[in-house]
Amino acid sequence: MSENNSVAGIFSGHGQIKTPTYKEQAYRLIKEAILYQRFQADTIYSQEAICQELGISRTPVREALLELQKENYIRFCRGKGIQIVSLDDQAIHDILEMRIYLEMAGAELAAQRATKSDLDYIRECLEANQRHHSTDNIIQNYRIDHQFHRSVAKAAHNALLYNTLDDVLNHYLRFETLTVYQSQTFAQSIVDE
């Protein structure tokens, strides 16, 4: 029986298995909290408090926050912490305008380039959207709806278009969830009176 301890090339093209780093996990959790209005816009949050809540050190949290700053979700307040960037009327207008343009371009390219498996996946997303549209879980509805829109963009086979639309959809999700949050807050204030 021959023994060969070399496995070089056996997994070529696949790379090493990688679990999400603390930075990636912090980025995902903080971004999700921003998108779903768990952070209040224009409120200053301590980086130290975020680190404690996540149970990780400052470095991965800081790296995640720097990335979120580049994406215009947060701003740093020198010596105080971070602040969630609020969506003003102009930002909302820009997001809506960009979404319309990107989705039109994506749909046109998808109509020309989509494979059978792309079309099957689009159909699955559309059916899921229709099944869940009547449920009371608004956040789940948004996720499913956005997955449908992402499936069309993915079928365009243009990575730049897909990535840009993905970013725009995330910013749009902030607007959608903010609207729901404000409606619920308003309704609760009426009930409380």
Predicted features, each with a name:
Residues 1-108, 112, 160:
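Short linear motifs at protein or domain termini
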Residues 10-11, 176-181:
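Short glycine/proline- and charge-enriched loop/turn segments
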Residues 21, 120, 139, 186-187:
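Short helix-capping and inter-helix turn/linker motifs at the boundaries of alpha-helical repeat units
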Residues 70, 74-75, 166-171, 185-186:
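Mobile beta-alpha loop/short-helix "lid" or hinge segments that flank ligand
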Residues 75-77, 145, 188-189:
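Short, flexible turn/loop "capping" segments at secondary-structure junctions
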Residues 95, 112-178, 192-193:
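Conserved amphipathic alpha-helical segments that form helical-bundle/coiled-coil interaction surfaces
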Residues 182-193:
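C-terminal regulatory/effector modules of DNA-binding transcriptional regulators
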